[in-house]
Amino acid sequence: LALRAPGLGEVRVQALASGVSRGTESLVFLGRVPASQREAMRCPFQDGEFPGPVKYGYASVGRVLDGPAELAGRRVFCLHPHQDRYVVPASAVVPVPASVPDARAVLAANLETAINGLWDAAPRVGDRIAAVGAGVVGALLGALAARIPGTRVEFVDPDPRREALARRLGCRWAPPERAHGDADLVVHASGHP
């Protein structure tokens, strides 16, 4: 399909990588977005309506092909659905530092979710924090929480492969049946009720 040229204040982006959310996008793909959540789950630049067909996604890293001189040729992150090229307002893209590989840059949307989760949970210095689920969002949340002085962060996840990740991030790991029951704060990030 032909893609229109960018107008004033817009950029044309060639996608390099796109992240797929196992939880959210599984609901979208299967047409199971609850009617009560459809407006909240709309993503920027979404095309179509729930339950579908719908063009969805919100984790694109690409290179600016055309646009303002300060962005031309730069790698950028955009909350855009999965497609190989797109035109968006220049204000919708964020430059990606050269030191950040594409595979990490696509996690920016997940990192935003983890940060918002911590803001809402309001952990305090010295809190014992349990992150239920050590997938992408849970791991990012745990990594951030572990930087708060005096905290003890424990990933509660049935997958024993998460133990090595927990250690690398300065956290503990336990399967549900061995989790500490003394948490001051519990954040559910498993994607499963």
What are these regions, as identified by a protein language model?
Residues 178-186:
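A short acidic, Gly/Pro-enriched loop at the edge of an enzyme's catalytic core
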Residues 101-176:
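Mid-domain Rossmann-like dinucleotide-binding core that forms the NAD(H)/NADP(H) cofactor-binding site
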Residues 190-191:
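Short glycine-/small-residue-rich Rossmann-like dinucleotide-binding loops
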